Amino acid sequence: MSFSRSFSRLASSKFVLPVAAAAVGLASYSFTSSSFIANEPSKAFKGGDEWIDLKLISSHDLSHDTKHLVFELPNKDDVSGLVTASLLMTKFVTPKGSNVIRPYTPVSDTEQAGTIDFVVKKYEGGKMSSHIHDLKPNDTLSFKGPFVKWKWEPNQFKSIALIGGGTGITPLYQLIHEITKNPADKTQVSLFYGSQTPDDILIKKELDALAAKHKDQVKIVYFVDKADASWKGETGYISKEFLQKNLPAPGPDNKIFVCGPPPLYKAVSGPKVSPTDQGELTGSLAELGFSKENVFKF
């Protein structure tokens, strides 16, 4: 029976007053709900094909080839609209009229209002990374999205291992940050992160702060190719022997996430075929008995 028919029948009975009160209550609930929704932060990015130009607020060096950039969202109270873990597409038009489009993962909190942060490494011959590095404050860059890579749910797994290299740290950092900011999420996190030198370890200050604050939940091991005398981490690549000793056992309660340059994928998990095709699992993880279901490649 529909609500309108039920209401009509009751309106002619001795229950008019209670029903009227209920109707008032319903109207009040509707108003309150609408007010609550209206008070939610507006989202700068809602999906679809619309490109949004964001103004660069600041840009500073993290290393000799990597910058931290902060862009201004359209309104000061806007949040990005992204979830963990997702990315935005970026676009600029060359002098000859060609579109250059590349994906980038923000490193800022999904609830951060007014601005959005990126860590971008400049690659030799990289059109977008070179363009972004040349941007000056008040310049704009076009963005579109979000595009969800893996939607994190609290306590999805008992433990996760994150294997990364270079700027592949960005979605892995998203995961660590999202998990540790939620006291109800008890997921155990291990990060194994490789860089060329100690100075090339990106957002190390932020990573170390999270590990120190959540020392019973987060474990981080850094690897560098070239170490100096003061280096206290691991030297060399992330080997199969290291993974065998430090990864959780294969199983549905554990998940491994991989993100980094092509040599890392080749050695650890095998490459993706495309953004929507994870490809076969090969490399160290396959040799250690993990299956495709145990591993996600960003």
UniProtKB/Swiss-Prot annotation:
TM ranges: 15-38
Superkingdom of the organism of origin: Eukaryota
Subcellular localization, as worded in the UniProt entry: Mitochondrion outer membrane
Cofactor dependence: FAD
Enzyme Commission numbers on file: 1.6.2.2
Gene Ontology biological process terms in this record: ergosterol biosynthetic process
Keywords: FAD, Flavoprotein, Membrane, Mitochondrion, Mitochondrion outer membrane, NAD, Oxidoreductase, Transmembrane, Transmembrane helix
GO (cellular component) term, any one: mitochondrial outer membrane
Domain FAD-binding FR-type: 49-153
Membrane topology reported for the UniProt record: Single-pass membrane protein
Pfam families per UniProt: FAD_binding_6, NAD_binding_1
Residues binding FAD: 156-191
Reaction equation(s) it catalyzes: 2 Fe(III)-[cytochrome b5] + NADH = 2 Fe(II)-[cytochrome b5] + NAD(+) + H(+)
Family statement: Belongs to the flavoprotein pyridine nucleotide cytochrome reductase family.
PANTHER family from the UniProt entry: NADH-CYTOCHROME B5 REDUCTASE, NADH-CYTOCHROME B5 REDUCTASE 2
Role this protein plays: May mediate the reduction of outer membrane cytochrome b5.
Protein name: NADH-cytochrome b5 reductase 2
Species whose genome carries this gene: Scheffersomyces stipitis (strain ATCC 58785 / CBS 6054 / NBRC 10063 / NRRL Y-11545) (Yeast)
